[in-house]
Amino acid sequence: MRRSLAPSQRLGVRIKSKDAFTPPLQKKNKRVCQEELQKRQSALRDATNRVELPLPIRFTANSEYEQAIAKVLARKFKVPIANYVPDYGGNRTLGVRRTIVRRALHDPQACNALVLYVPPAYTEHERMSMDPSKVQVHVVVDPILSNVLRPHQREGVRFMYECVEGKRGNFNGCIMADEMGLGKTLQCVTLTWTLLRQSPDCKPTISKAIIVSPSSLVKNWEKEFTKWLHGRMHCLAMEGGSKEDTTRALEQFAMNTATRCGTPVLLISYETFRLYAHILCKTEVGMVICDEGHRLKNSDNLTYQALMGLKTKRRVLLSGTPIQNDLTEYFSLVNFVNPEMLGTAADFKRNFENSILRGQNADSTDAERQRALQKTQELIGLVNQCIIRRTNQILTKYLPVKFEMVVCVKLTPVQLQIYTNFLKSDQVRRSLADCNEKASLTALADITTLKKLCNHPDLIYEKIAAKEKGFENSQNVLPPNYKPKDVNPELSGKFMLLDFMLAAIRANSDDKVVLISNYTQTLDLFEQLARKRKYTYVRLDGTMTIKKRSKVVDRFNDPSTDCFLFMLSSKAGGCGLNLIGANRLFMFDPDWNPANDEQAMARVWRDGQKKPCYIYRLVASGSIEEKILQRQTHKKSLSSTIIDNNESSEKHFTRDDLKDLFSFEANVLSDTHNKLKCKRCFQDVQRQPPAENTDCTSHLSQWFHCSNNRGLPDSILSQAWTASKCVSFVFHHRSQAESKPAAITEDDESEQQQQSPKRTSKNDDNDEDFDPENSAEEQFLGF
C-alpha cells in the first residue's frame, strides 16, 4: 500500500530547488572539498557579475570582505593611454606582474610567418648566464598582414626594415621606387605597424611616425591603415580644419614622448607640413615616410628644407615613377633619405658629376669616357644599397589583361586651318628667329595654345575672338552658327572619336570610363558632352576639397551606382587615386613628362580590378602632340641608369627644337610611325607581328601597328574607327597573354579578394599645363 504521493500527484504543491526529488539510486554523496569549491566559485561569480576571469591568486570568498577583494582583483585592466589598443586585446586582469620568459610577439614558426630579424642562437649555458632583460627575440610581422602580403611585398617589407634598422650598411633610409599598383602603401603600413610594436629587445622600435603625402592622398592613407589593421591603431589625419585646431593637434602630437602613444601616426600633406614644420621639428620622431617622393627632387624648395629639419634618422621615400635621369635630382633624393651617403653637394659634384658629364661630351677622349663609365658604375653600386624597384609586370599574375592603344586622330578641317595659319604667323617666326630665354617662354605659351587647339577650338576661342597674334583671321574659319558654350564634337577629331566610343560603350556594355586631361577647360567640354548625351558623371579637379574627393571616388567605384564617367584633372588627381570601378580610360592629351602620363593611366589597372582594361591615348596626327609622344618614347627607351646621355641641361629651347615642334605633317597617317622607320611594315601595313616576348612596356617600335581597323583588340575602337572616319593610325599592345590570369592559384585569388586598393609638380592641386620651375618639362630630347 502506497504511503506517500509521487511528486506529480501532489497537486498545488510546487517543489523548490532545495527540495528537489532525487531518486535514491542516483543520489551521490559530495565530498566536503567539492562543496567548498562550489561555494567559492558561486561566491566569485556573484561578486564579479557572473564574468569569469582568470585570477592571479587564490582566495576564499566566503565573507563580504573577501568578496570585495575578489571584485577588485577580477576587474579588467584598463590601459592608461588614450586610444591605445593593447596587443592582448584588453582581457587581462589586475594583479602582481609575473616574471615571464622573453618571447617574440608572434610565432616565427607559424605558417606564412614573415621574420624580419632572427636573434643570435644562444646555448643553454649562455641563456642561464645572461641577464633575462637582454635576451633578444625574433621580429615577426603581424599575421594579419603577413597572410595578405604577396611575395614581392614581403621582399619589399624586409628590404625597408633592413634599411631603416641599419642592417644593410651605415645608413637608415631607403627609396621604394616600385611602379604604380604594386602595393607600396600596404608595405609601408606593415613596416610602420611592426616598428611601432616590436623590436629585438621586446619593446617598440619607434613610438611615433609621420607620413607626408599629397593632400589628395591623406584620407586614402587613413583608410589603408583602418583597412589592413582593422582598427587596431588610431591615426591623426590632418585634413582641413582651422588653424587653431591644427596647431593644437600637432602640438599634442609633438609633445607626446611616451613609448606607446594612443595616436602614433600623423598623416599630413606636404603643404601643411611646410606651414607647421616649426612645431613638428621640435621633438624627435621615429620615422618619416614621404609618399610621391619625387616632389623632393629639388633640394632648394621650402618643403624639402622643412622635411630635412625633422629630427629622425629613419627616412623612407616612395615614388611610383622612375627616378629622373638627372644627376642633381638624383643626388637630392638620395641625400634626403641618407644625407651622408654621397657627401655634400660639392663632394658629389667633384667625385661623380664632373667626371660623368665630361664623359658625355661629344669631344670627350677615350680616357674621359672610360672614367665616366667607372664613376657611373661606382655611383650605381652606392645608391643601389638603399633603392628597390620592381615593375608592374609583377601584376600580370594577379590582374586581368590590359590593352594599351595609342590612337592617332586626324584634325578636322577647322582645326587644320587654324593650326596651319598660326604656324605661318609672325608670332611663330619671331620665336624661331630669337631663341633667348624670353623668347622660349613665349614659345611655351604658343606650344600650350597648339595643344589646346588639338583638343578643341573652344579652348582657344578667347584668343580667336580677341584676334591675338596668330589668330587674326581665325574667326572666319569657324562655322557661322558657332557657339562657344555649346559643345560641338564635330569641330574636333578627338571629340568626335570620343563621342562615338562613349556611345558604343554605353550601348553595348556596363563598363565605366575615366576621362583624363591636363586642362580643366577640356573637363568643362566633357561635362557639356555628358549632359548633352544624358550620361551620369562625376568630376575631380583642383577645386574639389579633400573630403569631397574621397566621397566622389567611393561613389564611382561602387558597382551599384550608375555613374558612367569619371572626369579627372591629371594635375590634381593623377597620382594615388584608385578607380577600379572603371576598366576603360581615355588619356585625352599627352604631357611632356612621360612619368605623369604613366601615373594618370595607372588609375584603373590596379589591385582589385576584375575586368579587362582598355587604355586609349589620343594624339592629333602630325601635330605637336605627336612630337611630345616621340619625346616621351625616347625618354622611356633610355637605359634606367644614373644619367640620360642625351638630356639637355639648357633651360630653354634650341632653334632645332622649335623648328621641330612648330612643324606640321598634314598628310601622314602617323608622324611617329614614319620616324620609327619600322622594318615590320610596308607602306604603313604591318607584315610581321612583334616578338612574342614584347608587351605594352616595350618600345613603340615593338607594338602592333594598324593603318586600318583590322586586328584591333577592341571592338569598340574598331566600330568607332569606321563610324567617325577620323582615326588614321593605331599602335597597340597588351600587358600579358590573355590566358595568364586563368592560371592564378586559389591562394592568389583569395589574396586578391582581400586586397584592393605620380605627378612631379610642386603642387598637385595646381591645374595648369606647364610649371616653369619643373626642369623635367623644360628639357626636351630628339626622337
Curated annotation (Swiss-Prot):
Binding site for ATP: D178, E179, M180, G181, L182, G183, K184, T185
Sequence positions bearing Phosphothreonine: T22
Cysteine disulfide partners in this protein: none
EC number of the protein: 3.6.4.-
Biased composition (Acidic residues): 765-776
Keywords: ATP-binding, Cell cycle, Cell division, DNA damage, DNA repair, DNA-binding, Helicase, Hydrolase, Meiosis, Mitosis, Nucleotide-binding, Nucleus, Phosphoprotein
A biological-process GO annotation: double-strand break repair via homologous recombination
Region (Required for chromatin remodeling, strand pairing activities and coupling of ATPase activity): 2-9
One family name in Pfam for this protein: Helicase_C
Region (Disordered): 737-783
Domain of life: Eukaryota
SUPFAM superfamilies hit by this protein: P-loop containing nucleoside triphosphate hydrolases (SSF52540)
All residue ranges annotated as the Helicase ATP-binding domain in the record: 165-340
Helicase C-terminal domain boundaries: 497-654
Assembly behavior: Interacts (via N-terminus) with spn-A/Rad51.
Sequence similarity: Belongs to the SNF2/RAD54 helicase family.
Protein name, as recorded: DNA repair and recombination protein RAD54-like
Organism: Drosophila mojavensis (Fruit fly)
